[in-house]
């Protein structure tokens, strides 16, 4: 590789003993690439390491982990107000890696690492909920959220993204729809929602394409609602009739307001947020991310 400015890798602590990653970093260092590595231990570490990255003058901060790690690092980057923030690099090491997968990030660690360091930095959108909590990939509510948050860690570690589906099938008889009202630009719907997906990215829950037309640089959020009063019949219909399915409601808007008569929970890139009122808005061009030239999430 040619000479590139230094990067700082923020590595999820669960991947600290990843031997192939150590070898990939060593090879790049042998080529003269400067890579600082910091390992997270607790919440807030990503913010501290992003602050350190600025002091070191690196041009790229690489998020090494799953969607939650990418969320923490990207949120810390968009909070930078003075000067130019480092670009975000993606190194998928989590259970599902939904955002990185849909963005076309290579699965091979060495290729992903090279892209994170040397890829073109593109401006992409993020989203913010209730003027506070951000997500880069997707906010999911209803059946999918409860499954994602309740799936045991050991099952996720053993089976990866498939674990969400297995745990969901085990819990189907106890899950009911969420009644809510959703408004957006030229959009209004109310009823019983089995699953709600509001996507900057396209997939969640270990590869489920909830918002298949979403783009990360169009200034819009994509909405998909899976409706129905009875879970099993509605889910069967959704899986077998994807075109013109009455159980699927789609929308697109720069913002969505959600009201529920009871508390519901949204999963924001793995981080649960509960309440009855949600204002979700897009943040156009919020950060720069190093992506492949043929990234399917770019218009």
Curated annotation (Swiss-Prot):
From its record, what is one biological process in GO terms?
Answer: phospholipid biosynthetic process
Q: Name where it's found.
A: Cytoplasm
Query: EC number(s) for this protein?
Result: 2.7.1.-
Residues annotated as binding Mg(2+): 215, 218, 220
Q: Which PANTHER family match?
A: LIPID KINASE YEGS, SPHINGOSINE KINASE
Q: Which cofactor does it need?
A: Mg(2+); Ca(2+)
Query: In the UniProt record, what gene is named as encoding this protein?
Result: yegS
GO cellular component terms, alphabetically, are: cytoplasm; plasma membrane
Query: What does UniProt list as catalytic?
Result: 271 (proton acceptor)
Q: How is the cofactor bound?
A: Binds 1 Mg(2+) ion per subunit. Ca(2+) may be able to substitute.
Question: What family does the entry list?
Answer: Belongs to the diacylglycerol/lipid kinase family. YegS lipid kinase subfamily.
Q: Does the keyword Disulfide bond apply?
A: no
User: Which InterPro entries would you find in this protein's record?
Assistant: ATP-NAD_kinase_N, Diacylglycerol/lipid_kinase, Diacylglycerol_kinase_cat_dom, Lip_kinase_YegS, Lipid_Phosphate_FormReg, NAD/diacylglycerol_kinase_sf, YegS/DAGK_C
Q: In its UniProt entry, what is this protein called?
A: Probable lipid kinase YegS
**Domain of life, source organism:** Bacteria
Q: Which residues bind ATP?
A: 40, 66-72, 95
What GO molecular function terms would the record report? ATP binding; lipid kinase activity; magnesium ion binding
